[in-house]
A protein has these predicted regions:
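Core alpha/beta nucleotide-donor-binding catalytic domains of modification enzymes
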Residues: 1-65, 75-79, 84-87
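Conserved beta-strand scaffold positions in the cores of enzyme catalytic domains, especially
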Residues: 9, 100-104, 200
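Short alpha-helical segments and helix-capping/turn motifs at coil-helix boundaries
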Residues: 14, 104-108, 184-187
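Short catalytic/ligand-binding loop motif for oxyanion handling, primarily in non-cytosolic enzymes
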Residues: 35-39, 77-80, 111-115, 128-131, ...
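S-adenosyl-L-methionine-dependent DNA methyltransferase catalytic core
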Residues: 92-95, 118-211
Length: 211
């Protein structure tokens, strides 16, 4: 809201939205909640109420009949345990008049300095008789952290005196030992080489990597 103060933002529960609540549009772009499909969760799929919101996306597309739509979600949705759910989602979108293509892409292959694997579903309305083709990975080397943020001036770090680490820590496999740290299998304060891409940046403001 602060970055785009003139944007019309409708925060109504998507399950309550009616046709007249949504303006006509050429395309619908969005990402149904990922928690039900994420490898970091219980992966309950449609058994999770958040997973059922995928069907609300289908409903909205059916209401507005845009020329195209784009759905983004986590790669966990491609796992075998969700095979039937994925087939149902695709058949539901096809049944309302769309040709569907989907593919797992990594943002790092498109000049983004971040390893971020996501599944993209693209639907084109059948009457348009157009075929969508996913772009190939961009040529050349990937953009590194050094190229993206290497010019940022480092600020002094302030340490929490109550969380000083013992010289004989029983916790091993740490990427970094300064400030609030965590094991390398978690996300907090992890550090990637300046010549690599960042870990996947999370939406929440906790467990974030340093870079």
């Amino acid at each position: 809201r602060k970055n785009h103060p003139n944007t019309i933002l409708n925060t109504t529960d998507v399950r309550l939205l009616k046709d007249q609540d949504i303006p006509s549009c050429d395309g619908v772009i969005g990402g149904p909640p990922c928690q039900a499909w994420s490898e970091g969760g219980k992966q309950l799929g449609f058994e999770d109420p958040r997973g059922q919101l995928f069907l609300e996306y289908v409903r909205i597309v059916n209401l507005k009949k845009p020329k195209f739509f784009v759905i983004e979600n986590v790669q966990g949705i491609l796992e075998d345990k969700h095979k039937q759910s994925l087939a149902f989602i695709i058949s539901s979108l096809q049944s309302i008049g769309y040709s569907i293509k989907y593919e797992l892409l990594n943002a790092a292959d498109y000049k983004i300095p971040q390893d971020r694997f996501r599944v993209f579903f693209v639907g084109i309305r059948n009457d348009l008789q157009n075929t969508f083709v996913f772009p190939n990975a961009m040529p050349g080397k990937k953009v590194t952290l050094r190229e993206a943020i290497g010019d940022i001036i480092e600020k002094p770090r302030f340490f929490n005196e109550e969380r000083v680490m013992s010289e004989h820590s029983t916790r091993k496999n740490h990427d970094v030992y300064t400030g609030s740290y965590d094991a390398k299998y978690m996300a907090r304060n992890r550090v990637r080489s300046w010549n690599e891409q960042s870990f996947t940046i999370q939406a929440q403001a906790r467990n974030e990597p340093q870079h």
